[in-house]
Amino acid sequence: MAKGKNATRRGERELAFQVLYGLSFTPARSLEELRRSFRMSPDNLARSEESGVPVEACGFSWELVEGVWSNSSALDETISRFSHNWRVDRMGRVELTLLRLAAYELVFRADVPPKVAINEALELSRQFGEGNAKNFINGILDAVAKALENGELQRCAAPSNTSI
């Protein structure tokens, strides 16, 4: 994969994280509210303004946002299964958002290698998380990846995404 695509995907993941983190404070109750939150995200608007690229061109980040939002219950069940002694409702918003994002990529996105999904989550945790957050996140995501690898957990097909 070209370095440019990696850098672009990293930026798309960061944007998806920021939108999803914002939604942890003000949840979207419908797909239309989700679209509005995505379009109106300050980071999305600033990025679109700076680059001249319309918000609609942020396809990968939208796929991640919609995928995590649409599958949050299943993702929380997966995270709970591998977060021994930690309930999802007791996790910090940053950590939970990063776990959901990476778990979505692990379970629903066959096009993303597990090591990439985990590494990207760890990079974002270094940027946005606190203290030992990366160790906590790494432990859970590594367990999810191993469960997928040995068949204890099944990979799901990503639902067809709707457009922004």
UniProtKB/Swiss-Prot annotation:
Q: Which Pfam families match?
A: NusB
- Alphabetical GO biological process terms: DNA-templated transcription termination; transcription antitermination
Q: Which UniProt keywords apply?
A: RNA-binding, Transcription, Transcription antitermination, Transcription regulation
Q: Name one GO molecular function term.
A: RNA binding
Q: Which GO terms describe its cellular component?
A: cytosol
Coiled-coil region list: none
Check the record and name the InterPro entries matching this protein.
NusB-like_sf, NusB_fam, NusB_RsmB_TIM44
Entry superkingdom = Bacteria
Gene3D superfamilies documented for this protein: NusB-like
Q: According to its UniProt record, which protein family does this protein belong to?
A: Belongs to the NusB family.
HAMAP family cross-referenced by the UniProt entry: NusB
What is its biological role? Involved in transcription antitermination. Required for transcription of ribosomal RNA (rRNA) genes. Binds specifically to the boxA antiterminator sequence of the ribosomal RNA (rrn) operons.
UniProt-recorded name of the protein: Transcription antitermination protein NusB
What is the gene called? nusB
